[in-house]
């Protein structure tokens, strides 16, 4: 397949599928399943074609408007390819879970596929112009999926989601327009090279002036970029849109929001913010670490107070993504020794693993919530259940594995990323890491409470005939649970492929 534009095919394929789904009516889910299965196959193929040195491969580059710094430029390394695989898996899970879309199924599944295209484009684009187009392409269908198929309070939830994410997009756009005016380039690679040499800040200062309100212009641009990505992750205090959006969206849509879209923010920090604004982020490292720790601890404590399972898992997602932020901001420090370099590599490997593992586990948990809702007429409160391990032992067992993965139990996928993050972060930012352990303890209490209240104790009379998972549900969930176990036992399957990219990234970042 030498010379075949596989990344373009991967990105355009969902758009073709969306058109077909839109015209297919009640058969739209079948079209979406076939389309997403093809996407997963292509994403896995891309994963096998990565350069062994960790550089960006499968490059596709064509001039569009050179005078405006716009070119069609796609490529992937271990980070991008892993996010492609995650996006493909989560989208397939979401489509498979959406068994009860009776209102305009063609439009629903068409929007899901458009969102998938936006995800793939965001993880492969290497030029700001069309990266931003794909970034926004994921926002629009997500808004309508919440607005049209969400719960009773879907209107305010969708509006809040749109306003927050659009505000973040504006911050990104303004910052990059300033960078373009200073450099005449939107290419991430060229801009990263300028930043590594210290020339980017000089060009920005020459073009836009020394700064204002006591800060250099470059620092303000870094703040704008960080704010844009912080909304998407989300990072405290930009997280307030998330609980309503996650709880009001249909569970299959929530799977996409938490499993894939939230990773766009973390990916943006690694692909764009650190390479271009590493020096500025290092200068703001202490307050950023404070916000990361606040994200970890606040997410965990907020989850304790929730009675709605979707809101419990929503705040738990904030907590888990906070560990990614902890690892990222902890490593933003000049290397003073070989030990520091090893700690940076451990933290970054952990962040990338955590992105994948959280996406897989969180999507699975919201899928299980969808199953509970379908069997109880929409109930999803922690106190609405009890003793389900008796009438539904398979569901209890498989959901229990996903819950223990979220808890970070050794032997499951959720443990590995967090372990590597803390292994690296403790030597780079020991105070922040120590405080963040509180988040681990509180998360354990939350997960164990869910297990105890949902699966243990007496079975309420109305749940005595609660149906266990169907054969189809077991077949669909088995690969997901199997992957959790496989990564937990053999994490090197991912680490060995990602580590060259980690080494390559760290070698080019300047703090």
Give the residues covered by each predicted segment.
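Hydrophobic alpha-helical transmembrane segments of integral membrane proteins
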Residues: 10-11, 137, 230-233, 239, ...
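Hydrophobic transmembrane alpha-helices and their helix-loop junctions in integral membrane proteins
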Residues: 93-99, 117-129, 142-453
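Short, aromatic-rich membrane-interface segments at the entry and exit
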Residues: 7-8, 28-33, 105-106, 129-133, ...
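Transmembrane helix-loop-helix hairpins at membrane boundaries of multipass inner-membrane proteins
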Residues: 1-6, 20-112, 185-205, 504
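Hydrophobic alpha-helical membrane-insertion segments
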Residues: 34-49, 165-178, 441, 479-493
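Membrane-interface helix-loop-helix modules in multi-pass inner-membrane proteins
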Residues: 61-82, 126-134, 138-143, 407, ...
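Cytoplasmic/organellar membrane-interface segments at the starts of transmembrane helices
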Residues: 13, 193, 249, 378, ...
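Central hydrophobic cores of alpha-helical transmembrane segments in multi-pass inner-membrane proteins
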Residues: 8-22, 33-48, 84-98, 115-117, ...
């Amino acid at each position: 397949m030498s010379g075949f534009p596989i990344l373009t095919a991967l990105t355009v394929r969902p758009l073709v599928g969306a058109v077909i789904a839109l015209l297919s009516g009640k058969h739209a889910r079948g079209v979406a399943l076939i389309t997403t299965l093809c996407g997963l196959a292509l994403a896995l193929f891309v994963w096998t074609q990565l350069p062994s040195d960790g550089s960006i491969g499968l490059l596709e580059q064509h001039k569009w408007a050179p005078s405006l710094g716009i070119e069609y430029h796609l490529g992937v390394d271990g980070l991008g390819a892993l996010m492609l695989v995650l996006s493909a898996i989560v989208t397939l899970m979401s489509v498979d879970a959406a068994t009860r879309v009776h209102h305009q199924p063609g439009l629903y599944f068409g929007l899901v596929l458009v969102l998938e295209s936006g995800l793939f484009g965001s993880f492969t684009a290497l030029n700001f112009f069309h990266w931003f187009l794909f970034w926004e392409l994921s926002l629009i269908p997500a808004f309508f999926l919440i607005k049209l198929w969400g719960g009773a309070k879907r209107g305010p939830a969708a509006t809040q989601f749109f306003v927050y994410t659009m505000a973040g997009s504006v911050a990104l756009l303004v910052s990059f327009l300033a960078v373009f005016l200073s450099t005449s380039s939107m290419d991430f690679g060229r801009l990263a090279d300028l930043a590594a040499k210290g020339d980017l800040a000089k060009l920005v200062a020459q073009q836009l002036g020394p700064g204002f309100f006591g800060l250099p212009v470059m620092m303000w641009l870094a703040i704008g970029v960080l704010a844009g990505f912080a909304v998407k992750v989300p990072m405290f205090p930009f997280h307030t849109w998330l609980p309503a959006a996650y709880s009001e969206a249909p569970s299959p849509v929530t799977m996409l929001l938490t499993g894939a879209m939230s990773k766009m923010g973390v990916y943006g920090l690694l692909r764009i913010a650190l390479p271009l604004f590493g020096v500025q982020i290092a200068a703001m490292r202490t307050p950023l670490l404070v916000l990361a720790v606040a994200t970890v601890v606040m997410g965990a404590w907020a989850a304790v107070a929730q009675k709605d399972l979707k809101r419990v898992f929503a705040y738990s997602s904030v907590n888990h993504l906070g560990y990614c932020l902890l690892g990222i901001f902890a490593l933003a420090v000049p290397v003073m020794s070989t030990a520091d370099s090893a700690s940076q590599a451990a933290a970054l490997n952990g962040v990338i693993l955590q992105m994948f593992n959280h996406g897989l586990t969180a999507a699975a948990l919201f899928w299980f919530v969808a199953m509970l809702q379908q069997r109880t007429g929409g109930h999803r409160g922690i106190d609405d259940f009890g003793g389900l391990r008796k009438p539904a032992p398979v569901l209890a067992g498989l959901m229990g594995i996903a819950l223990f993965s979220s808890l970070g139990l050794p032997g499951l996928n959720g443990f590995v990323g967090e372990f590597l993050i803390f292994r690296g972060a403790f030597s780079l930012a020991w105070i922040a890491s120590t405080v963040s352990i509180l988040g681990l303890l509180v998360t354990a209490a939350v997960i164990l409470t869910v297990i105890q209240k949902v699966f243990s104790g007496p079975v309420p009379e109305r749940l005595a005939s609660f149906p266990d998972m169907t054969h189809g549900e077991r077949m669909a969930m088995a690969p997901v649970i199997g992957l959790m176990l496989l990564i937990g036992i053999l994490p090197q399957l991912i680490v060995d492929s990602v580590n060259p990219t980690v080494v390559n990234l760290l070698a080019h970042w300047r703090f």
